[in-house]
Amino acid sequence: MVDIIDKALRMGEGHQLKKLENVAKAVNALEDEISALSDEDLKAQTPKFKQEIENGKSLDEIMPEAFATVREVSKRTLGQRHFDVQLMGGAALHWGNIAEMKTGEGKTLVATLPTYLNALEGKGVHVVTVNDYLASYQSELMGRIYRFLGMNVGCIITEQKPPERRKQYNADITYGTNNEFGFDYLRDNMAWEKADLVQRGHHYAIVDEVDSILIDEARTPLIISGPAEGDVTRWYRQFAKLVLKLTRDEDYDVDEKKKVVGILDPGITKVEDFLGIDNLYEPANTALIGYLNNAIKAKELFLRDKDYVVTQGEVLIVDEHTGRILPGRRYNEGLHQAIEAKEGVEVKAENQTFATITLQNYFRMYDKLAGMTGTAETEAAEFMNTYKLGVLPIKTNKPMIRKDQDDLIYRTKKEKLAAIVKDVAKRHAKGQPVLLGTASVESSEVVSTLLDVAKIPHQVLNAKQHEKEAAVVAVAGRKGAVTVATNMAGRGTDIMLGGNVEFLADAKLKSEGYSPEDTPEEYEKRWPGTLNEIKAQVKDEHEEVKELGGLYVLGTERHESRRIDNQLRGRSGRQGDPGESRFYLSLEDDLMRLFNTQLVAQVMAKGMEEGQPIEAKSVTKGVRTAQKAVESRNYEIRKNVLKYDDVMNKQRTVIYSERQAVLKGEDIHKDILRFISDTVESYIKGANKGSEKPKDWDWEGLFKALNTVIPTKVDEDEVRKIVGGLKGAKAVEAVRDLIVEDARQQYGEMEETIGETGLRDLERRVVLAVLDRKWREHLYEMDYLKDGIGLRGMGQRDPLVEYQREGYQMYNSMIEAIKEETVQLLFHIDIKQVATTDEAVDEVEETAESADTIAVASGPDENGESVVEAAEGEVEEEDEDTDAKQAIAESAAASGAGESTLPVAGPAPISHAEGKVPVSKRPKSEELKTPWADGRTFPGTGKNAPCPCGSGRKYKMCHGQNEK
């Protein structure tokens, strides 16, 4: 199906490319005219273009002249002239496409064209990069063009405070990473004051390395979270010790391909003996299963220096795709704690989600979206289906002459590594620069050790050397350079033969104390001379390296994605330079072992000798077949994630829209009055027990329950007399009107006490407090629902349809709860005892959970595990030697006789096959988030009546759920 879509998408490429060529011709036709303009005349172009837009001209109409202007300014500031293919790429981006341009074709410079053009509308343009360094570097370097033309340039980086971030967003053009843009969106939707908002909309975004951000990280939700209640760190440490006593394949199964584990009967017996319990699968021991599965996963599936590194007593996740450390991020659902326990470092507290959105849904909010990458065509169908983005391959400025050799396959990793070192030694001896791409930190360090033994000088670039990334890559093309890099580390900085001229010139000026931001005039004055000086130094070496064959890229193993292999290869052969690439494989590599067992069997059958490789197109083809299978699987996972997140996205859009309206001062007084009426009517309907006759209603229960929300002064006997002769809807309406009239009178008295302005402000604050709390509870309950919804398929029901249906019901229940709690809070503030509105607000906010201390995070990675950026905080250490049996006894004593011995995870079904138990989502005792988990029902209770269990919820939102 995907292949058919790909073919259909390519059918229109010729027509699109013709349009792009026409744009380049139109720009070239203006070059002489624009080149003749003085600096002042060029600067006057910006106000002229803005006036033309105001007068009704479209961006398409002014595009040729605007592009020609940017090209001329680039020549004068950077010494770089846009090639025709770069003009074509700029037009493709302006029209909302992905421009596929090979490495070294100057994508960063291409982005200046549509960025300037779209910034003329005054609505802001976001340029999205993969890390803070690139955002800062590009905003400085390319910012010279924009600043020359009178545009403001901002840059969002991690450490900035809200006032500074707001200033950066208010600039005409803002650079930043995908995470920073996404988190600021979430923070804006948690703000309590309009003045705290930082973003100003989502008009146009250009995403650099778009495949990395919109494909590789698409399954990663951005999450803002805070610490959950309770300290269960002892359990993680106990289970970390316990699993060391268990044996793989004897006590538990591991499926490395699917990244799941399963406990076997002998293992269950050992666990029960160790913990001193009779049955691991009793409801009281539900949470133990989660600790056990996470401990096994931490032991078998998450490897140090591959999936994570340990630095200064902290477990830091390594991005599988880039090899970069992800500072502050944490795996969710207790997995990170299990890894911390395994490594013997401090086990930090679990977190509770406050706000979340996937990158897919965040970027789909933009009015116009575009992207750049060197490798998008393999994912063209997904880009179109998910983001409505077409992929336009832009031809290279000069023909590609890189030689891509067939793969070499060896029996073992040891043989493969020996061959790699031999090949590198040969290349290094003649001075040819070599880039070795590895799949993990561990692999890079193994290769580095072998190169040290062979006395081959080299640089290592992996997650542990993140800070020097750009500097290492900038000189990786120099004569004799040998660079070992994990996957795509260093992506975003060109490897130029002889050295990266622009980077070296910028570094030299900064070392002398000149910066394009701090000392722009001096920097601009010295730039041409410094650039020419570096060019002269690099020129001879560039030619020498070309004669040696250019950059040799050596892949130490294949990645699951063809795209990432192509990105590694793409580091060589830029701008028509010579180059060569080859991948070395072994039958022990993960891709071969897990996804291509048939090819492995065929190779083994040939009886390979030690150290003897197989080099054949059939091997390369077999590897690509395995990669296609993995890519297809990952695409289906991303599609599935998006389908489920679309349910939440619709709800989130409505909630955030309403919240923004309240935050920005919309008068909600009429809404409050409607909340009062709706709440009263809901309670009346809950008390009538389905009877139309008022004499059959539970009047005592009605007024008792109603007084917990609105302390009504209406006399029960008087009401019964008035409605005695009425039935059905008329009776309900009459009772409602009497109680609502009394409530409004009380509310009016409240307004007289604190004034109209004071009450409006109080209403706004109360609604925000309640909405935030209920939305967090809703996220919590939707997570529960999603965790167990897959099991509905066993009952011949579509899990997605079930999730949509129940999610909608839960959303409606949340809306009712927001109305009810808002009314309850407003009527239970003792206004007479509160001197000012601020004090009243403080009283309200004390009733809601505080979200001042938050953690920022990113969720399920490619393995389906969630990652979370946790806030810093002190975690009280438990005694490492605490015995597990004693811990269970203590927990039982604390919870009371006959109650669960552990904080039970809640009503979500447990998938033993996947080992997924959301233990981090334990209900808070005072909130009783899942009181209906005991399975009880109370027949005869009205669905809107208070639940007899005493939780304070309506029956339908509590134990009434057990009747479904």
Curated annotation (Swiss-Prot):
Task: Cite a single Pfam family from the UniProt record.
Answer: P-loop_SecA
Residue ranges, compositional bias (Low complexity): 889-900
Q: Which GO terms describe its biological process?
A: intracellular protein transmembrane transport; protein import; protein targeting; protein transport by the Sec complex
User: Any idea which positions bind ATP?
Assistant: Q86, G104, E105, G106, K107, T108, D494
Which residues are recorded as binding Zn(2+)? C947, C949, C958, H959
Cofactor(s) it depends on: Zn(2+)
Q: What EC number(s) does the entry state? A: 7.4.2.8
Which reaction equation describes what this protein catalyses? ATP + H2O + cellular proteinSide 1 = ADP + phosphate + cellular proteinSide 2
Q: What membrane topology does the annotation report for this chain?
A: Peripheral membrane protein
- According to the UniProt record, where is the region Disordered? 848-964
- Give the record's GO CC terms: cell envelope Sec protein transport complex; cytosol; plasma membrane
Q: What is its main location?
A: membrane
Q: Sorted alphabetically, which keywords does the UniProt record give?
A: ATP-binding, Cell membrane, Cytoplasm, Membrane, Metal-binding, Nucleotide-binding, Protein transport, Translocase, Translocation, Transport, Zinc
Q: Where in the cell is it found?
A: Cell membrane; Cytoplasm
Manner of cofactor binding, per the entry note:
May bind 1 zinc ion per subunit.
Q: Where is the composition biased (Acidic residues)?
A: 871-882
Instruction: Fetch the PANTHER family from UniProt.
Output: CHLOROPLAST PROTEIN-TRANSPORTING ATPASE (PTHR30612:SF0), SECA INNER MEMBRANE COMPONENT OF SEC PROTEIN SECRETION SYSTEM (PTHR30612)
Q: What interactions and quaternary structure are annotated?
A: Monomer and homodimer. Part of the essential Sec protein translocation apparatus which comprises SecA, SecYEG and auxiliary proteins SecDF. Other proteins may also be involved.
**Role:** Part of the Sec protein translocase complex. Interacts with the SecYEG preprotein conducting channel. Has a central role in coupling the hydrolysis of ATP to the transfer of proteins into and across the cell membrane, serving as an ATP-driven molecular motor driving the stepwise translocation of polypeptide chains across the membrane.
- Would you identify the family this protein belongs to, as annotated? Belongs to the SecA family.
What protein am I looking at?
Protein translocase subunit SecA
